[in-house]
Amino acid sequence: MTKDELTEEESLSGKDYLDPPPVKTFEVRELKKWSFYRAVIAEFIATLLFLYVTVLTVIGFKSQTDINAGGGACASVGLLGISWAFGGMIFILVYCTAGISGGHINPAVTFGLFLASKVSLVRAVSYMVAQCLGATCGVGLVKVFQSTYYNRYGGGANMLSDGYNVGVGVGAEIIGTFVLVYTVFSATDPKRNARDSHIPVLAPLPIGFSVFMVHLATIPITGTGINPARSFGAAVIYNNQKAWDDQWIFWVGPFVGAAIAAFYHQFVLRAGAMKAYGSVRSQLHELHA
């Protein structure tokens, strides 16, 4: 269907797009489809590659700026380079996997989409497990290939930086994840996609750019989590007490941020609550007519 060919339902509602129906919470029939397992595998591989490239970049940055090892600030990629590595990999991997799994690569994104009824509980849990396993394997490969530098430079693990309290750390993770998940909702909004055929193709770009911008802002505070799988995988392989003590920050913050973004987009910007209220009023009116 082209944008100029409206169905009778669309004409009556005055809409030139169709919202996809909400996904059932318990959609067990997915377990019988190969496309489901293909999507889970895609999430595993994408998260593995994401952690492999980004953690290598972080360790390379720290080794190049280590004065004791003959490095210097001008010899490294800097925070800008690290941010580009994270944002660039998200752009690449979302572009590659969007048509297969939706390109989540992040339990917080999956959680936000689940709350918005975009994915089922079965798919959400499976994605999160695959993402955490992929992240762990990705960091494991980094340790194998960079065994000399891995433990010396912190293993790319997320930890609350000195001088910041827990509240600041959690707040940074909440706001950072809100920016990311809000961008995901906006970039994949069917209303916007219906009006511009280029939007679906370009969606990975703003998503990756949001990751880049959030990293610039929050690397000094928490090292930037906004992705529980990224934080979990690094903590498992690095296995440092402080990394484990701070681990909850990188789950609570992102999940709260994702929940707020889902609520804001669905019930404020898309007026989900008003639509539901209007539907109930219409049904009650028909019953009493």
Curated annotation (Swiss-Prot):
This is Probable aquaporin PIP2-6. The modification Phosphothreonine is found at T7. The modification N-acetylmethionine is found at M1. It comes from the Eukaryota. Keywords: Acetylation, Cell membrane, Membrane, Phosphoprotein, Repeat, Transmembrane, Transmembrane helix, Transport. A motif (NPA 2) lies at residues 227-229. Residues 1-38, 102-124, 187-200, 270-289 are cytoplasmic. Signal peptide: none annotated. It is a multi-pass membrane protein. The chain crosses the membrane at residues 39-59, 81-101, 125-145, 166-186, 201-221, 249-269. PROSITE patterns: MIP. One of its GO terms (molecular function) is mRNA binding. Belongs to the MIP/aquaporin (TC 1.A.8) family. PIP (TC 1.A.8.11) subfamily. One of its GO terms (cellular component) is plasma membrane. Residues 60-80, 146-165, 222-248 are extracellular. Pfam families: MIP (PF00230). The modification Phosphoserine is found at S11, S279, S282. Aquaporins facilitate the transport of water and small neutral solutes across cell membranes. GO terms for biological process: response to nematode. CDD domains: MIP. The lineage of its organism: Eukaryota, Viridiplantae, Streptophyta, Embryophyta, Tracheophyta. A motif (NPA 1) lies at residues 106-108. Aquaporins contain two tandem repeats each containing three membrane-spanning domains and a pore-forming loop with the signature motif Asn-Pro-Ala (NPA). Expressed above ground, and in flower buds. It is found in: Cell membrane.
